Amino acid sequence: MRLKKYLHLLCYLVLILVCAGVVYLLGELGGSHPGTGKETEHSAQTPEESTGGTGAGETSQPETDESSDRFSDGSEDSETENGEAGQEESYEAWLSDVLKRNPQKGSIGGKKRGAGKKNDRSDDSETKNENSEEYVPPTIMIVSDLHYMSGTMHDDGTAFWKMVADDDGKTSQYSDFLMDALADTVLEKKPSALVLTGDITLNGERENHEKLAKRLRAIQDAGVPVVVIPGNHDISNKNSATYFGKEKEEAEYLHSGEEFYEIYHEFGFDQSPNRDPSSLSYVYPVDAGHWLLMLDSCQYENGNKVGGRIRPETLTWLGVHLRVAQEHGIEVLPMAHHNLLSESRMYTSECTLENTYDTVNLLESYHVPLYISGHLHAERIKKHKPEPGTSADDYGVSEIVMPPFSIPACQYGILSWDTEGGMHFETEKLDVESYAKKVGSTDEHLLNFSTWSPGFVKGIIKNQVMKTITLVPDDLKAEMAGLYADLYYDYCCGNKMSWEPVRATAGYKLWQRVLPDNVYTKRIAQMIEDVRDDLHIWDSPASQ
């Protein structure tokens, strides 16, 4: 009888320890505000404008769907007297739920970053594909700097074309058509997700946001999940405008992150098991073994800033998820709008994160292989070297800067994982011509997009540069500006450049002889030095 009592007591003790472990893990991932230890409402909470009812550092707390509350209580009332959140689901239960909702995604596995060994749970029968199909790791399609402009925002008149002529080569006149072609391509390729890394509208116009959301909803309804984060153009942008007649006019724009969330909550936010209370950052599970860490790097609380920064609270939040992902053998991919590294000799300000040092250190402390961004309007691939002389074979976080979709060659990225945790990335050009033929377009520019569009971009840039050159005959101006425009196009696209053919041109010789100290002369050198190789393919090193 005494032995039976001891056995019962032992069972209770084991049960208590298991429950305590689950509560501890959920407490790490759940409703505690990073760095405070206090429970906060789990929501798409974002800093409000300074002109609102909240002061600096204060945040609003919109209501959220239950689907976003898997890791936090979602309610202040759920906090118990001893500070423990009343959680109903364990982390393991969430993983199981992901597999049930995504049965084709297969089992959880992969290498622990920095550990170099398989996750012990990869052979757990509970995580195996219920359909007994061979597991295929996910593939995502990435688009940055979409700068969508609805045709309802302009009349194709004087004000509109002045904007196009003063811009950086965007084909805004075809924005609707390019979105149609992109949607058609997405549904043909059927990636695990379509990811938009910011600057999704021209200048944050509310109407452009709403029209874009409708288009994204159609893609998602057709079976491809859409995942979105903002860029610096998307929130609190007073350059928001319509273009009718001879002059542009101010247009309504989004004033806060909360308004962005209200429009786009169904594109990644609602599917997230955990959102950062201090920004629009969130975790998006592509499947149970692969997470996108969607980071809000934009500064829109007090007006609109071009430069980016990851909030300190967000870095703390990010660190928790990096640790948990490492412990569970989950592959992570951080994505933001602003650049992690110094990527350009030509664009040296307001591109790299203001707190890049802290962010790089955090990512590298968990051996994160890759970070993806946009913003620069030029494709770049670079690996961080902690100090000069570091071997090329040594670990360092790599960054891929996506080319701007809004500027020809209208490129997007395809990133895929393999079963060992490796990654492959490459850019592809949107096949505008094929889609134009498919829908019966009679527009010669669209039917010959691959040959017409480079000339369009170069023509825009050439005209802008020519206006800055004085005391030089027009034919020589055209020679000089034409060379710069040619290099600019290749720079944006990430196409290989070299000195030898450039130095042989009449245009370069004129720059050197007539305007050796001109900013464009310097930029020619900077562009060539930045892009010495084609920047369209990246593979994760096997050692990582």
Region spans (language model):
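Extended active-site neighborhood of metal-dependent phosphoesterases/phosphodiesterases
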Residues: 97, 211-316, 393, 398, ...
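Acidic/histidine-rich helix-loop elements
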Residues: 147-178, 204, 244, 301-310, ...
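Active-site environment of divalent metal-dependent phosphoester hydrolases
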Residues: 149-152, 202-204, 232-240, 300-303, ...
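Active-site-proximal beta-strand elements of phosphoester/diester hydrolases
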Residues: 137-150, 289-300, 335, 398-403, ...
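His/acidic metal-ligating clusters that form di-metal
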Residues: 187-193, 291-293, 305-398
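Non-catalytic terminal accessory segments
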Residues: 2-69, 73-132, 437-544
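N-terminal active-site segment of His-dependent metallophosphoesterases
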Residues: 86-110, 114-116, 120-206
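Metal-dependent catalytic neighborhoods of phosphoester/phosphodiester hydrolases
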Residues: 197-217, 237-257, 344-352, 380-389
